[in-house]
Curated annotation (Swiss-Prot):
Residues that, per the record, bind S-adenosyl-L-methionine: R124, G154, D175, S222
Gene Ontology BP term (one): glycerol metabolic process
GO terms of molecular function: 3-demethylubiquinol 3-O-methyltransferase activity; 3-demethylubiquinone 3-O-methyltransferase activity; O-methyltransferase activity; polyprenyldihydroxybenzoate methyltransferase activity
Cofactor: Mg(2+)
Family: Belongs to the class I-like SAM-binding methyltransferase superfamily. UbiG/COQ3 family.
Keyword list, A-Z: Acetylation, Magnesium, Membrane, Metal-binding, Methyltransferase, Mitochondrion, Mitochondrion inner membrane, S-adenosyl-L-methionine, Transferase, Transit peptide, Ubiquinone biosynthesis
Organism per entry: Rattus norvegicus
Topology relative to the membrane: Peripheral membrane protein
Keyword Methyltransferase set for record: yes
Oligomer status and interactors: Component of a multi-subunit COQ enzyme complex, composed of at least COQ3, COQ4, COQ5, COQ6, COQ7 and COQ9.
Name of the molecule in the record: Ubiquinone biosynthesis O-methyltransferase, mitochondrial
Role of this protein: O-methyltransferase required for two non-consecutive steps during ubiquinone biosynthesis. Catalyzes the 2 O-methylation of 3,4-dihydroxy-5-(all-trans-decaprenyl)benzoic acid into 4-hydroxy-3-methoxy-5-(all-trans-decaprenyl)benzoic acid. Also catalyzes the last step of ubiquinone biosynthesis by mediating methylation of 3-demethylubiquinone into ubiquinone. Also able to mediate the methylation of 3-demethylubiquinol-10 into ubiquinol-10.
Catalytic activity: 3,4-dihydroxy-5-(all-trans-decaprenyl)benzoate + S-adenosyl-L-methionine = 4-hydroxy-3-methoxy-5-(all-trans-decaprenyl)benzoate + S-adenosyl-L-homocysteine + H(+); a 3-demethylubiquinone + S-adenosyl-L-methionine = a ubiquinone + S-adenosyl-L-homocysteine; 3-demethylubiquinol-10 + S-adenosyl-L-methionine = ubiquinol-10 + S-adenosyl-L-homocysteine + H(+)
Lineage, top ranks: Eukaryota, Metazoa, Chordata, Craniata, Vertebrata
Gene Ontology CC entries for this record: extrinsic component of mitochondrial inner membrane; mitochondrial inner membrane; mitochondrial matrix; mitochondrion; ubiquinone biosynthesis complex
Length: 345
């Protein structure tokens, strides 16, 4: 923009693009030898302005400079804020965020782009409930998860968060996409009971960890791990926010040739069951790979079950075959379980 102290034609076009009314002198900008000279006779010499023209030119030029620098500062601030949103997290993928920003308005359309997720609740909600009740002493059939605190990671518009809240749990839903949280907040506001039980936050899992170490009875990451950047770090964070003995629930897509053909080619490109670009096959993870990450990080795999979606009926079913979708339940070891046999004797 500046060449040898002169504002180039490219710089002029940039100012005009920003909507500035540049002085006519910009067409032939004066040479500036010192940016510290902004007053008196020295300014008239540096800008090559005649003394009797100094007042008008000074006002016009300084006004343009102030506007330009102010605008550039704001642009730099916005750019820094945009980067900060993602730089604070090593698990959030900015490309994935942009994909779901464009889909935020569709969350609660049961016949729309997220219809398979609505239908998946028929499997994943009982899966979470039943496994949590194995270690629960609560016998309230109306609110079986009462007294439990659950973290729903990547909650989106709250499709799974709300059913868990209706079962009596206190649920915190987090998502890096502000548009998703806005939709979720709006939807829960129609139910006064859910409005009290559910909290939503625009943040990453790492940010939640800073204030919620060993705070949750369960962490849910449903259809999330295939979208994160650093899976091992993600699992480590899940472990750290769980109470000893807490449960981690994951539903995701296996990394197989069949999942590529049906999960991406057919579902996204041919049938349009899910929007194009929703999934990246390289990020799919097999049950074996997932277990190899969970176990060294203190999470013992209790259950792995296959799931299959019928696009014609719109329903999900359990299956022994995990080559497409599957659900996993892992448990963080309790404190006493870490003791050596000699110590626990």
């Amino acid at each position: 923009m500046w060449r040898g102290g002169r504002l180039s034609s490219r710089g002029v076009r940039f100012l005009e693009t920003l909507g500035f009314a540049c002085p006519s002198a910009v067409a032939e900008p004066p040479r500036v030898t010192s940016w510290t000279a902004f007053s008196g006779n020295q300014l008239t010499r540096n800008l090559q302005i005649k003394p009797w023209e100094f007042s008008g030119h000074r006002t016009m030029w300084l006004r343009s400079y102030r506007i330009t620098f102010s605008c550039l500062t704001r642009l730099k601030t916005y750019r820094s804020s945009w980067k900060k949103l993602y730089s604070t997290s090593q698990t959030v993928d900015s490309k994935e965020v942009k994909t779901f920003q464009a889909l935020a308005h569709s969350w609660w359309d049961e016949q729309g782009k997220f219809a398979p997720l609505h239908s998946m609740n028929d499997l994943r909600v009982p899966f979470i409930r039943d496994n949590l009740l194995k270690t629960s002493t609560n016998h309230d059939p109306g609110k079986p998860l009462s007294g439990m605190k659950i973290l729903d990671v990547g909650c989106g518009g709250g499709l799974l968060t709300e059913p868990l809240g209706r079962l009596g749990a206190s649920v915190v839903g987090i998502d890096p996409v502000a548009e998703n949280i806005k939709i979720a907040q709006h939807h829960k506001s129609f139910d006064p009971v859910l409005d009290k039980r559910i909290q939503y936050r625009v943040c990453s899992l790492e940010e939640t960890l800073n204030e919620n170490a060993e705070c949750f009875d369960a962490v849910v990451a449903s259809e999330v791990v295939e979208h994160v950047n650093n899976l091992e770090m993600f699992i480590q964070c899940c472990y750290q926010v769980l109470k000893p003995g807490g449960s981690l629930f994951i539903t995701t897509v296996n990394k197989t040739q069949l999942s590529y053909v049906l999960g991406i080619v057919f579902s996204e490109q041919i049938a349009g069951i899910v929007p194009k670009g929703t999934h990246t096959w390289e990020k799919f993870v097999s049950p074996e790979k997932l277990e190899s990450i969970l176990e060294p990080n203190g999470l013992s795999v209790e259950t792995v079950a296959g799931m299959v979606y019928n696009p014609f009926s719109g329903y999900w079913h359990w299956t022994e075959n995990t080559s497409l979708n599957y659900a996993a339940h892992a448990v963080r070891a309790r404190a006493q379980e870490h003791l050596e046999p000699a110590e626990s004797a």
